């Protein structure tokens, strides 16, 4: 689950990680009150959306007077934000963050992330901040340092010394850096985060380290342990079908292809996406209905996939170990019989009650193409999608 910037800053502030004061406004009137609270005559106004690239796409405005700040609040609250990270979708802007300007001497990057290659949390630092870290890694690898954390000791003193030396922080700045890194790592573990990113982390002219922007992602599977974080979920920032899938308990991720997929098991679902791509097709979604979905859940899953107007072909790929193929067939038929315009459908059923499942579909009169092979089914679905 992603947090908005202001929510991320609230979390980091609770761990004594320093940053300039900030306030959130959802109207011009609130923006006016915010100016009085902050006591500023100039500042930065930023849209609060679950996407990066805000500065490059008009989502951040530097204002040099109270009038400019209020004008920026009004302008940003009426926009729908689009960047290369929104997959072409326009995200609504319901809040903006207002914060004072800072005299910056240097910008850095600091993050704690899950390193899937090494299967451990990793601290990532860079002497170049305020830019895309991917770009820095490619062009200036010598300006980036990564430190792997163990699940037991978590962070050693020699690692802290290595990081402070690499960043060139001396004296009080170095002491601040040590404490900030310790607190950030503690925050990462305490909240089951998969990403804590500060970009930029700045050193002021006075030598203080401050967080100017923060991004936090919490492991969805651990949210039951963090009720105070769970309530921060903002469905307005997600695809409508993603939100609906969560409500009905399905693992669904919207993609940008035109072949709708309904599969049981995450591994089989990933393999289905891969083989469609191998044969020149593109999936419209990832959907894992699980191993024990009921007929009602299958109906909801089929309806969910077909609600995507980009879906031109439906590919059902079920391996029925625990799953009952007849329940899948009944759920499919129940939905299809209510629709006027049927799209081409490819069905691969294997396992428990497979013959009964096929019979249910065939007797319904719904035009479906059956296959016993995943490879053949994928080829057929791709051909129908062209």
Curated annotation (Swiss-Prot):
Organism of provenance: Chlamydia abortus (strain DSM 27085 / S26/3)
Note describing how the cofactor binds: Binds 1 Mg(2+) ion per subunit.
Keyword check for Ligase: yes
InterPro entries to which the protein is assigned, alphabetical: ATP-grasp (IPR011761), ATP-grasp_succ-CoA_synth-type (IPR013650), ATP_grasp_subdomain_1 (IPR013815), Succ-CoA_synthase_bsu_CS (IPR017866), SUCC_ACL_C (IPR005811), Succ_CoA_ligase-like_bsu (IPR005809), Succinyl-CoA_synth-like (IPR016102)
Summary of subunit composition and partner proteins: Heterotetramer of two alpha and two beta subunits.
Binding positions for substrate per the UniProt entry: 264, 321-323
Molecular function (Gene Ontology), one example: ATP binding
Annotated protein name in UniProt: Succinate--CoA ligase [ADP-forming] subunit beta
């Amino acid at each position: 689950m992603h947090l908005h910037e202001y929510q991320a800053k609230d979390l980091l502030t609770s761990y004594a990680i320093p940053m300039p004061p900030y306030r959130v406004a959802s109207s011009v009137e609130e923006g006016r009150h915010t100016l009085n609270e902050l006591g500023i005559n100039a500042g930065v106004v930023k849209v609060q959306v679950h996407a990066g690239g805000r500065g490059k796409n008009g989502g951040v405005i530097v204002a040099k007077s109270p009038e400019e700040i209020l004008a920026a609040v009004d302008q940003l609250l009426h926009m729908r934000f689009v960047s290369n990270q929104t997959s072409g979708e326009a995200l609504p802007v319901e809040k903006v963050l207002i914060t004072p300007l800072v005299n910056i001497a240097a910008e850095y990057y600091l993050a704690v992330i899950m390193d899937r290659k090494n299967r451990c949390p990793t601290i990532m630092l860079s002497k170049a901040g305020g830019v895309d870290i991917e770009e820095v890694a490619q062009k200036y690898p010598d300006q980036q340092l990564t430190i792997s954390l163990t699940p037991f000791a978590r962070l050693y003193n020699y690692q802290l010394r290595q990081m402070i030396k690499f960043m060139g922080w001396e004296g009080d700045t170095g002491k601040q850096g040590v404490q900030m890194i310790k607190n950030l790592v503690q925050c990462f573990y305490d909240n089951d985060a998969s990403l804590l990113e500060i970009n930029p982390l700045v050193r002021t002219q006075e030598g203080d380290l401050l967080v100017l922007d923060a991004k936090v992602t919490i492991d969805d599977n651990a949210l039951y342990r963090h009720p105070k974080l769970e309530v921060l979920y903002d469905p307005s920032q997600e695809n409508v079908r993603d939100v609906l899938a969560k409500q009905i308990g399905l693992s669904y991720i919207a993609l940008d292809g035109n072949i709708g997929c309904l599969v049981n098991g995450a591994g089989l679902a990933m393999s289905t996406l891969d083989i469609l791509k191998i044969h020149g097709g593109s999936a419209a979604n990832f959907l894992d209905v699980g191993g024990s979905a009921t007929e009602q859940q299958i109906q909801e899953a089929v309806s969910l996939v077909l609600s995507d107007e980009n879906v031109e072909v439906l590919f059902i790929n079920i391996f029925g170990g625990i799953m009952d193929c007849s329940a899948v067939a009944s759920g499919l038929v129940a939905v299809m019989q209510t629709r006027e315009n049927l799209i081409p459908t490819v069905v691969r059923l294997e396992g428990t009650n497979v013959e009964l499942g096929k019979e249910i579909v065939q007797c319904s009169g719904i035009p479906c193409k059956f296959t016993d092979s995943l490879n053949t089914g994928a080829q057929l679905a791709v051909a129908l999608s062209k």
